[in-house]
Amino acid sequence: MASSSGSNHICSRVIDHSHVPEFEVATWIKITLILVYLIIFVVGILGNSVTIRVTQVLQKKGYLQKEVTDHMVSLACSDILVFLIGMPMEFYSIIWNPLTTPSYALSCKLHTFLFETCSYATLLHVLTLSFERYIAICHPFKYKAVSGPRQVKLLIGFVWVTSALVALPLLFAMGIEYPLVNVPTHKGLNCNLSRTRHHDEPGNSNMSICTNLSNRWEVFQSSIFGAFAVYLVVLASVAFMCWNMMKVLMKSKQGTLAGTGPQLQLRKSESEESRTARRQTIIFLRLIVVTLAVCWMPNQIRRIMAAAKPKHDWTRTYFRAYMILLPFSDTFFYLSSVVNPLLYNVSSQQFRKVFWQVLCCRLTLQHANQEKRQRARFISTKDSTSSARSPLIFLASRRSNSSSRRTNKVFLSTFQTEAKPGEAKPQPLSPESPQTGSETKPAGSTTENSLQEQEV
């Protein structure tokens, strides 16, 4: 008897047909979201489009490897698709006018599938880009094995194929349906709520929404929980890699002399510039993890709430918590696709400089070889002027210091093959990479040969 009384008490709080119109948010929320979504849309499209152009310029000018460029361009494309596919359709069908008729079932399925694919492509691109940087910093001798053009294409292909597989179940589980249709296979509350024509004839209901179909409940649940597991694995993996990269970057590199013969490697005391670059990189790595956690978690919680139990078992408190969370989770989710260009600008002075040049249509960046030659000529002229009145030991010291100053101001150096003799080859650099404050220099190298030094 007590069990029956408790069940009746819970059933008195379960939503019914009178609550269905509340799936449409209040007008003031709609207007606020219009303004917020418009700002996010413009900033996101512009920022990611400029990012694509900047990475192409940096690669062409010799500052960025093609493999890193491919990763960043693919990530920016997935972010742009998230905005183009997700934001207009989601705002209209979920926020502005959620109640519709079943005639829009195909558009609901396609939108959900494509949006899920692009969303998880963005997530997995963060994973692969972090993995590429992790190998370069923590396991540099293994870097070439995973950084070739073929390996990068395989990684990018893996990202898009895996994202499509994660989203594929939603193509069958989603559709247009009256939200309170009973799920036949679900053993939930037996409340015997009053039925309406929308229950009996869901195919003719004008109060349907784009939601999970009642006869595909298990498919929907497995899809949402599986996607959540993928998110947790990616978050944990990126956090692990960023933590290990930060440990490597925080190690002291003072006073180490290694090597034999003509090749000597001198690890110098860090300059203020190197310390600043390292601090910015550590901040950048932390921001990657924070962005994945803060921007993605609210949306994942909302999805788990939708998959935890069918809507006909939702209490009024549960339903209102879901509707309050909806606009916040969507906003934070779209912000995750806006912050990537911002992180690049924070992490690299070179990227930030070219970003604003592209934005202002005033590109003045010189090729890396040309810039190094100009610096070499300036140093040669300066050294020849002062050599008559300076001991050779001080002259050699100044040349060593000038070589240190020629290090490009970017963060995680990308290892390249050494230039051939007599050929100046630039050191392409990743815009999210810190300099390590060490150099490899042949004994007795001339100023011209300094263009071929390999800076690690």
Curated annotation (Swiss-Prot):
Glycans are attached at residues 192, 206. InterPro entries: GPCR_Rhodpsn (IPR000276), GPCR_Rhodpsn_7TM (IPR017452), Zinc-sensing_GPCR (IPR052676). Keywords: Cell membrane, Disulfide bond, G-protein coupled receptor, Glycoprotein, Membrane, Metal-binding, Phosphoprotein, Receptor, Transducer, Transmembrane, Transmembrane helix, Zinc. Residues 430-456 have a biased composition (Polar residues). GO terms for biological process: adult feeding behavior; cellular response to zinc ion; cholesterol homeostasis; diet induced thermogenesis; establishment of localization in cell; gastric acid secretion; gastric emptying; glucose homeostasis. Residues 56-69, 132-151, 243-283, 345-456 are cytoplasmic. The chain crosses the membrane at residues 35-55, 70-89, 110-131, 152-172, 218-242, 284-305, 324-344. It is a multi-pass membrane protein. Zn(2+) binds at residues 17, 19. The keyword Kinase does not apply. PANTHER family: G-PROTEIN COUPLED RECEPTOR 39. Zinc-sensing receptor that can sense changes in extracellular Zn(2+), mediate Zn(2+) signal transmission, and participates in the regulation of numerous physiological processes including glucose homeostasis regulation, gastrointestinal mobility, hormone secretion and cell death. Activation by Zn(2+) in keratinocytes increases the intracellular concentration of Ca(2+) and activates the ERK/MAPK and PI3K/AKT signaling pathways leading to epithelial repair. Was originally reported to be the receptor of obestatin. However, numerous reports concluded that GPR39 was not the receptor for obestatin. This is G-protein coupled receptor 39. It comes from Mus musculus. The gene is Gpr39.
